[in-house]
Amino acid sequence: MLYFENDYCEGAHPAILQKLTETNFEKVSGYGTDPYCASAREKIRAACACPEADVQFISGGTQSNAIVIASMLQRWQGVVAAATGHVAGHEAGAIEYTGHKVITLPQHNGKLDAAELRELVATFYADDNHDHMVFPGMVYISHPTEYGTLYTKAELEEIGRAHV
């Protein structure tokens, strides 16, 4: 059985262990200033076609999610996620700690449904008091989901259109 709980539940791929063994005794500076991080930065910049991008490495997924969500949302906005989405439960309040609410929708094998998202947004804006409520400012997608399911391109496109 495959489990998609988090990346801490499994060991490393044999190729990664081999590379770690090969480089174990190399003396390099730490904290992202080593040649391996420099190489990774260049590969990320090239893949994103952003040669001037400031690429930073974060220690884990929770920290990454919290930083990205906090930096992209206004203080009155929240993030919409499936009830089983990682930010809705497994991150132990890290998102809420930044001052942003996680707005949950029902999950369907771990996925969000675009029609339900569309309804949430429509209901929010139809409420005359919505200026006093948490705005749905972002949609969080787990891919694969906590159930191991994958969104199709069409599902992602529909979710993107539902939130506009």
Which sequence ranges carry the predicted segments?
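N-terminal amphipathic/basic leader segments beginning at the initiator methionine
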Residues: M1-K19
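Conserved N-terminal alpha-helix of the aminotransferase class I/II PLP-enzyme fold
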Residues: H13-G61, A83-A88, A94
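Solvent-exposed alpha-helices and their adjacent loops that cap or buttress functional pockets
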Residues: A47-C50, M72, A94-Y97, N129-V134
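Conserved core of the PLP fold type I
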Residues: E52-L73, I103-G110
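Conserved PLP-anchoring active-site segment centered on the Schiff-base-forming lysine
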Residues: S71-G89, R118
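PLP-dependent aminotransferase-class I/II
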Residues: G99-E146, L150-E155
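Conserved small/polar residues in nucleotide/adenosyl-binding loops
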Residues: A162-V164
